[in-house]
């Protein structure tokens, strides 16, 4: 009889411990959802990245947040985890950065290069697509196969489609500036020099 009571007490203790852990997790998730509601780091429809998961927020419940990833997978992240991890909210960006090197060929002259830099800088500064105070355009490098112009600006459009449309238009307009100044984009190339001239062979018909 005494052994049976001991077993019953042991079972109750294990059950109580399991319930305590379950309650702890549940309370942590409820607290996490409360933090999300109060702090508002994101809302339904936002594009976020947190704890290795990136996608669009579809639903926020007391237990978890549902995120639709770009491969269209549905990931449920516990709110307790989200409330204690860094969150990147891409939707809340006010502007987006464009940065690239524009490589032109080595036969570009000093005057051409100077004009290119000035024209691109003036174009971007006056463009409605970007913030004028963020524009940087400089002749920067003598690279292996190109003379590099360093270009940086921030677009006013922060959503993906708007950003890509702005970047496309900027690329097309810079291409036109290159054409107007008689310059060409460079590509990797190799020059081979022979110490002695190669003999040319001809076939007699």
Label the predicted regions.
Residues 27-30, 80, 201-205:
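Short, structured secondary-structure boundary patches
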Residues 35-131:
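Soluble accessory domains appended to multi-pass membrane transport proteins
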Residues 3, 72, 77, 82-85, ...:
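Residue-level signal for pocket-adjacent positions within structured domains
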Residues 88-90, 96-99, 104-205:
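Solvent-exposed, non-transmembrane regulatory segments of membrane-associated proteins
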Residues 13, 52-55, 141:
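Transmembrane helix-bundle signature of multi-pass membrane transporters/permeases
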Residues 1-25, 31, 35:
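Hydrophobic alpha-helical transmembrane segments and their immediate juxtamembrane helical boundaries
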């Amino acid at each position: 009889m005494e052994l049976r009571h001991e077993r019953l007490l042991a079972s109750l203790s294990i059950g109580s411990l399991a319930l305590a852990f379950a309650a702890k997790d549940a309370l942590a998730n409820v607290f996490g959802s409360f933090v999300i509601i109060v702090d508002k780091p994101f809302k339904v429809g936002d594009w976020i990245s947190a704890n290795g998961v990136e996608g669009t927020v579809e639903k926020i419940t007391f237990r978890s947040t549902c995120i639709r990833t770009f491969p269209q997978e549905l990931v449920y992240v516990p709110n307790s985890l989200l409330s204690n991890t860094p969150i990147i909210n891409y939707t809340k960006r006010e502007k987006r950065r464009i940065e690239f090197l524009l490589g032109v060929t080595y036969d570009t002259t000093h005057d051409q290069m100077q004009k290119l830099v000035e024209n691109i800088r003036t174009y971007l500064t006056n463009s409605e697509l970007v913030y004028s105070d963020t524009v940087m355009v400089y002749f920067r490098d003598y690279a292996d196969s190109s003379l590099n112009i360093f270009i940086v600006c921030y677009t006013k459009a922060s959503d993906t489609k708007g950003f890509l449309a702005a970047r496309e238009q900027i690329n097309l307009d810079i291409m036109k500036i290159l054409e107007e100044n008689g310059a060409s984009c460079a590509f990797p190339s190799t020059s081979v020099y022979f110490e002695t001239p190669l003999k040319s062979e001809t076939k007699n018909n």
